[in-house]
Amino acid sequence: MRTFQEIILALQHYWTRQGCALLQPYDMEVGAGTSHTATFLRALGPEPWKAAYVQPTRRPKDGRYGENPNRLQHYYQFQAVLKPAPSDILELYLGSLEELGFDLRQNDIRFVEDDWENPTLGAWGLGWEVWLNGMEVTQFTYFQQVGGMNCKPITGEITYGLERLAMYLQGVDNVFDLTWTKGLSYRDVYHQNEVEQSFYNFGHSDLDFLFQAFASHEAQARHLVEQGLPLPAYEQVLKAAHTFNLLDARGAISVTERAAYIGRIRELARSVAHAYYESRKRLGFPLAPVEWTQELLEKAA
């Protein structure tokens, strides 16, 4: 039986062998692994990119005080990002399942069409959910747009739900019963955090502070974009997005206001995406093959 940390190590070794740079989690609250700069920003422009990383993910509304066996406000995703998306990306994914110990002939693996969209980040793509014996464990996406900008070449993203994969591999029905490593369970590591963070998310966050924080992060992001600093600006966008999610968890935002807030974050994300693209362009897209860069600049002329 693979422990939770052994599953992570196996995926890291597998994607490293496929030529991916093994990166570390982004050190801020994000609602999905896609929000890591290694995906959101690196999907822009002509520069090739191959990376893999674990990303802790926070979704305040999904907290259940540690009482739900498979729903958490904090959990883990594993991301593999391949740009341009290789023609054999599905085969590479199936190879990763074999690496984890799945017998592809003995398990029901289905690719269910499910195009992906993140309205907050102005991103969308064509894709599939991967169902393993009736449970969704992975999302495939071919990015079409990020920050409202067309992606060329197309980036392929594979997002694994680590807890779900581990629950199947370990044969448990409760996420807290997962073996993290010998002598240590997922409950030992994270149950108290789920309980306390749920109380914070749903009852003890300071609404006045959060509304003020959102406005401050929004203003700071705009200022940083104007100063030509897209990376710090993007961090402010992520802070604004997490603050919005906390307000949403408290029910402090009406349906009408919710759409308006999402629109404000999306506009920030778009401005950051454009600023980042221009910053790489000024550098001459240093990671791109010369012929790609020349073709792009000629079309823009």
Swiss-Prot record:
List where this protein forms a coiled coil. Answer: none
Q: Give the protein name, as stated in the record.
A: Glycine--tRNA ligase alpha subunit
Gene designation per UniProt: glyQ
Q: Which UniProt keywords apply?
A: Aminoacyl-tRNA synthetase, ATP-binding, Cytoplasm, Ligase, Nucleotide-binding, Protein biosynthesis
List where the protein spans the membrane: none
Q: Name one Pfam family in it.
A: tRNA-synt_2e
**Major localisation:** cytoplasm
The family annotation for this protein states:
Belongs to the class-II aminoacyl-tRNA synthetase family.
Catalytic activity reads: tRNA(Gly) + glycine + ATP = glycyl-tRNA(Gly) + AMP + diphosphate
GO terms, biological process: glycyl-tRNA aminoacylation
UniProt organism field:
Nitrosospira multiformis (strain ATCC 25196 / NCIMB 11849 / C 71)
CDD domains on file: GlyRS_alpha_core
What's the Enzyme Commission number for this chain?
6.1.1.14
Give the EC class as a word.
ligase
Q: What does the subunit comment say?
A: Tetramer of two alpha and two beta subunits.
